[in-house]
């Protein structure tokens, strides 16, 4: 993968990465405070100050508005699946925090987020164990 300087990214590319972070957290059962916090950390990592970012969350949609001083840019992202995977939530939170505080390369941060996204869609427990747990819980 080529080295990409995050300062040369368009505002649209930056907003997509911020929304990717929020979507990953929302689809894996994170709370709204954590989603907003980690999205703002990702924005700060990309050079966007928190004062210039407005984030609004609903059950299935993330809305972000960024003011770059000249114009405002708005993007929406739909979240179609909702589940619980606290490992993915923890990994995504750590990834955004490490990217910000350790000044991680952009490519490594994006690759890490995509890896977390791929691993979060895999089944954690075997199907027989889920069925057994449901049976025990409902008896």
Question: Could you say what each language-model-derived stretch is?
Answer:
Residues 36, 109, 127-129:
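Short coil/turn segments at secondary-structure boundaries
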Residues 98, 107-110:
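Cytosol-/stroma-facing membrane-proximal "stalk/adaptor" domains immediately downstream
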Residues 119-139:
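Core alpha-helical transmembrane segments of integral membrane proteins
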Residues 1-103:
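Soluble N-terminal domains of membrane-associated systems
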